[in-house]
A protein has these predicted regions:
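N-terminal Rossmann-like dinucleotide-binding module
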Residues: 1-49
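Beta-loop-alpha module in the N-terminal Rossmann-like domain of NAD(P)-dependent dehydrogenases
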Residues: 52-96
């Protein structure tokens, strides 16, 4: 039975690379489930690199995935709304 923390990363900008490398480094305890970003070109690159599901809509991702943790690597101006949405879905959150 796999008992890893299931993670989604939201936002594929510069800071997300630090989180992706940490997830890879601790692959025995963490599992990247999906990635969300509004930029479809970035999503395509990330899908090829990490071979996980991708979403362009946070709400859709939260409805469709069973996650333990969401890492928000998005612009600070939208953190509050995204944090509340994740909390309403019962997901733990790291806000960059």
């Amino acid at each position: 039975m796999e008992n890893k923390i299931k993670i989604a990363v939201v936002g594929c900008g510069h800071i997300s690379s630090k989180h992706f490398s940490s997830i890879e480094k601790h692959h025995n305890k963490l599992k990247l489930i999906c990635i969300c970003d509004s930029n479809k070109d970035k999503l395509l690159l990330m899908k090829k690199k990490f071979k996980v599901k991708t979403y362009s809509n946070l709400n859709e991702m939260l409805k469709n995935e069973k996650l333990d943790l969401v890492v928000l690597c998005t612009p600070s101006g939208i953190h509050a709304d995204q944090t509340v949405l994740c909390a309403k879905h019962g997901v733990n959150i790291i806000v960059e």
